[in-house]
Amino acid sequence: MVLMLGTGCFLVLVLLSIMSLYQWGHAILAISSKKSASNQRSARTTRFLILIPAHNEEDGLPETLKSLSTIQYPKDLVHIAVIADRCADDTAKVARAGGAQCLERSEGPGGKGAAMSWAMQVLRNEGTLFDALVIVDADCLADLHLLEAFDDALAKGHEVQQGYNYLSNPWETPFTRVIAVTSVLRNFLFYGGKEAMGCSAMLSGTGMCLSRSVVDQHGWSAFSVAEDWEFSVSLLLNDVIIHFNPLARVYARESKGLKQASRQRLRW
């Protein structure tokens, strides 16, 4: 019995050591790899459709739309659409006041994944013209160079991209400070390490970019609570690599504490 316990502990230690080495390998590669700067191409021709899934987001949506309106990219090449999914507030009114197209959904299965799948089908039926789809949550602020960074990576053949997700309020509470640290570690060390190794990243729900060909071929086929990871696995099974783009940045407002964060993550 003692021998079996000893063997079990040894195997656990070996497994933990392997996992630790794997993570340290990611970190070393991420730190040592050179970050390529944006190409700063003068001629922009890529048409972007920015899709904002929203469920009772009247409070945060105005700031999101305001940040998107200031992005440095030709305005005639950007179309913004908000999915007002089963909202009991003024999300739809706020979306239209902010200059966005509003797609109102009042029935059907719940969940962010179902809302996005429905919206993509509606926009396709309407004949909305776009070369790439960007998904941004309704409580996020967009970096000025978000679309330029996505466009430069698209030009290099990266058809699916995950941008750098950080917080807009990293120093507000001890909880947000912890989340900010984990965000940096996840972005720079984990995703950055995978990128340096030539491996695929994982989608994170916001700050995502899909080429039109990927949208046409795969649509949105993930409907679980973790729809971003589910869709990531679906893409990987179809040999589609997810490129981590650290220059394409969005900033989400994090909840002040764990209880609020739990409600926020399950708000759909």
Each language-model region and where it sits:
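N-terminal membrane-anchoring/stem segments of glycan-assembly enzymes
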Residues: 1-44
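Active-site beta-to-alpha loop of glycosyltransferases that engages the nucleotide-sugar donor
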Residues: 52-66, 86
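Long helical/loop segments within the catalytic core of UDP-sugar-dependent glycosyltransferases
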Residues: 104, 111-126, 144-224, 262, ...
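Short, acidic, metal-binding catalytic loop of nucleotide-sugar glycosyltransferases
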Residues: 66-77
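Cell-envelope/extracellular polymer assembly enzymes that use nucleotide-activated donors
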Residues: 46-49, 79, 230
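A conserved acidic beta->alpha catalytic loop
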Residues: 84-92, 107-109, 141
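Short beta-strand-to-loop acidic/aromatic patch adjacent to the donor-nucleotide binding site
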Residues: 127-141
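Acidic helix N-cap motif at the loop->helix transition within catalytic regions
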Residues: 62, 89-97, 145
